[in-house]
């Protein structure tokens, strides 16, 4: 007798219960339920986004293996959150798209079959879009305003302005989020749109497969049929002459047909080594939109929104603490939140700065720089007195030293923003935020200041304390 999805999930849970610790099973496995089982695809529903992410990353493959042992054939396990399924239930077949980055076709025959398939089904199953990467989940700040506006513009009117749209920025700053948001937006407006989201690696692998299987025409037909193509991590095309050649012709075919092209990279076209000049020219002919690292206020807004999406009550001082600690990219910031939530969920300890700080400190030792030490060393390097730094003096030298002191105190101690303000003569927490932002900006353009700040950090051994 064939098992229903619920029956299969019950058996899988029973098998897992004997192999997992009780806290792990009770926290992650038991709350999940089976929402569907068809076409060898078992779809599980977790109570929230955090739980679904955790279950997907850590246990989906194990669940699939156990299920295969029970029913005797391989299955695919999909893990969604309650809000994902709510969003999918009344939408397009995009809900069946896997978030894995699978090649568009494993053989030339499959590629040819896919080209001949009705456009109402194949294109919507191709993108591999993450359902969380939509515009209303993207926090816009000064660092990303232009890129966000351009992405929305091409999503609303593809192939008109900004073609191609080239989004560049460092790792974890939101490039992929914006690209996939464009794809979601187009599919929402036009469910029949042929939207392709691929990484450069996938494009290269598909090309290699097509060459080996004598399927170049099917490969070209498939990619050039796109109404909207989103190509991620184009920097990995460097030095791949044949891939660059094929992408050049694909680009021209799509652009000449008025199809929208969106490209993402960790650097501008002109800075990608061993990239053909004609590709640099093509990539630069539309709009190059840069995304910078978010400032403190934007990081706080990102954390707040993420916490709301995950239905997590996050104390404001903890938001301030995490935002001040993790400054380089959004992925790192959200990773810190994930660890904090996991820590609280597993241990049952409420999330506070005091409880979370030791766990977030990479050294596992905590940070033991004192506020007084920061003031003393900053005073020494910047040639001002400790009293000057605590005063209301607006002399440039004093003001700069005070801002650096606030910046380093945020990095080297566990003090909240209001506490840091109190240390500097009762300054408001907004003054501290402003000081941190100013130092962050100046460090990128002022080598002398960067050298002075590093000198203070060396004296305080802030970096070595974190590495221990």
UniProtKB/Swiss-Prot annotation:
One of its GO terms (molecular function) is DNA replication origin binding. Residues 345-468 are annotated as: Domain IV, binds dsDNA. Residues 86-127 are annotated as: Domain II. Pfam families: Bac_DnaA, Bac_DnaA_C, DnaA_N. SMART domains: AAA, Bac_DnaA_C. One of its GO terms (biological process) is regulation of DNA replication. Residues 128-344 are annotated as: Domain III, AAA+ region. Residues 1-86 are annotated as: Domain I, interacts with DnaA modulators. ATP binds at residues 172, 174-176. It is found in: Cytoplasm. InterPro entries: AAA+_ATPase, Chromosome_initiator_DnaA, Chromosome_initiator_DnaA-like, Chromosome_initiator_DnaA_CS, DnaA_C, DnaA_dom, DnaA_N_dom, DnaA_N_sf. Keywords: ATP-binding, Cytoplasm, DNA replication, DNA-binding, Lipid-binding, Nucleotide-binding. GO terms for cellular component: cytoplasm; plasma membrane. Belongs to the DnaA family. Domain I is involved in oligomerization and binding regulators, domain II is flexibile and of varying length in different bacteria, domain III forms the AAA+ region, while domain IV binds dsDNA. HAMAP family: DnaA_bact. Plays an essential role in the initiation and regulation of chromosomal replication. ATP-DnaA binds to the origin of replication (oriC) to initiate formation of the DNA replication initiation complex once per cell cycle. Binds the DnaA box (a 9 base pair repeat at the origin) and separates the double-stranded (ds)DNA. Forms a right-handed helical filament on oriC DNA; dsDNA binds to the exterior of the filament while single-stranded (ss)DNA is stabiized in the filament's interior. PANTHER family: CHROMOSOMAL REPLICATION INITIATOR PROTEIN DNAA. Oligomerizes as a right-handed, spiral filament on DNA at oriC. This is Chromosomal replication initiator protein DnaA. The lineage of its organism: Bacteria, Bacillati, Cyanobacteriota, Cyanophyceae, Synechococcales.
């Amino acid at each position: 007798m064939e098992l229903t999805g619920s029956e299969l999930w019950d058996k899988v849970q029973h098998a897992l219960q004997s192999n997992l610790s009780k806290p792990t099973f009770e926290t992650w496995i038991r709350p999940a339920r089976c929402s569907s089982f068809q076409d060898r695809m078992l779809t599980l529903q977790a109570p929230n986004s955090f739980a679904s992410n955790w279950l997907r990353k850590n246990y989906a493959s194990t669940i699939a293996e156990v299920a295969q042992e029970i029913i005797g054939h391989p299955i695919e396990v999909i893990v969604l959150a309650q809000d994902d399924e709510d969003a999918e239930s009344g939408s397009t077949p995009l809900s069946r798209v896997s978030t894995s980055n699978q090649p568009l076709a494993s053989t030339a025959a499959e590629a040819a079959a896919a080209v001949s398939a009705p456009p109402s089904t194949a294109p919507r199953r191709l993108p591999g879009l993450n359902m969380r990467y939509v515009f209303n989940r993207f926090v816009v700040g000064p660092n990303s305003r232009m890129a966000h506006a351009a992405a929305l513009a091409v999503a609303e009117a593809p192939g008109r302005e900004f073609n191609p749209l080239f989004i560049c920025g460092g790792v974890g700053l939101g490039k992929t989020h914006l690209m996939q948001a464009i794809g979601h937006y187009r599919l929402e407006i036009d469910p029949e749109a042929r939207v392709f989201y691929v990484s450069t690696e996938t494009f290269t692998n598909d090309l290699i497969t097509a060459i080996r299987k004598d399927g170049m025409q099917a490969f070209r037909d498939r990619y050039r049929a796109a109404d909207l193509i989103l190509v991620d991590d184009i920097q990995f095309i460097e030095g791949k002459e044949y891939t660059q050649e094929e992408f050049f012709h694909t680009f021209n075919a799509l652009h000449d047909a008025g199809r929208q092209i969106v490209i993402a990279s960790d650097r501008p076209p002109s800075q990608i080594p061993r990239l053909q000049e004609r590709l640099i020219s093509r990539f630069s002919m539309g709009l190059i939109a840069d995304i910078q690292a978010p400032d403190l206020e934007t990081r706080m807004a990102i954390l707040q929104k993420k916490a709301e999406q995950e239905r997590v009550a996050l104390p404001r001082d903890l938001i301030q603490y995490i935002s001040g600690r993790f400054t380089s990219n959004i992925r790192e910031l959200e990773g810190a939140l994930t660890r904090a939530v996991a820590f609280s969920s597993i241990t049952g300890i409420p999330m506070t700065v005091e409880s979370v700080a030791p766990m977030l400190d990479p050294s596992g030792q905590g940070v033991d720089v004192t506020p007084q030490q920061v003031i003393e060393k900053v005073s020494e390097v910047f040639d001002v007195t400790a009293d000057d730094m605590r005063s209301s003096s607006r002399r440039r030298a004093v003001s700069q030293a005070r801002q650096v002191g606030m910046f380093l105190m945020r990095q080297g101690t566990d003090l909240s923003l209001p506490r840091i303000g109190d240390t500097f003569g009762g300054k408001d927490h907004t003054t501290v935020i402003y000081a941190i932002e100013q130092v962050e900006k100046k460090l990128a353009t002022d080598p002398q200041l960067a050298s002075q700040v590093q000198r203070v950090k060396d004296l305080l051994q802030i970096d070595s304390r974190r590495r221990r």
